[in-house]
Amino acid sequence: MSRAAAVALRLAEARSPRLSVNPARIEGGGPNNVVPDLAILRVNFRPADLGEIERARAHIDATVAAVAAAHDVAISVHGGFNRPPKPIDAGAARLFGIVKQAGTDLGLDIAWRDTGGVCDGNNIAACGVPVVDTMGVRGGAIHSDQEFLIPDSLPERAALSALTILRIAEKGSL
């Protein structure tokens, strides 16, 4: 477990404004008088661009090599970067402009903010299709057992989606 913690701490050092690193969970162990033969570390990396993926991979490789050598342990890496970064490109900026104007016309303040989150939209954007996320209902505490939605936001968000789709249909393209 302590070796997994060493890996977690070293991986966290890769954090930067362009790379989010979350050593989220260490599993393993048992009675406190037994040295476990296995520990599993789960880490989430969220890169802002493809260059950060390469930097993260290099940091992972260097961390694994350093901790394995220093502590005489075997470390295996599983998984990878399965959601490419989703930067705001020209198409996404045009789409956001349509959404923002639709919001203004409905009396809604629509603002863009980078959350660093990932979703299926990352895969769609990687195919060159413009994506704007989180147009759904308002709420909070996302991804927790306290997650909630504000019921009054259902009609406003339906109207926002409908007006956005109408405007795109009227233009015939983005």
Task: Tell me what each language-model feature is.
Residues 1-174:
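Metal-dependent amide/peptide-bond hydrolase catalytic core
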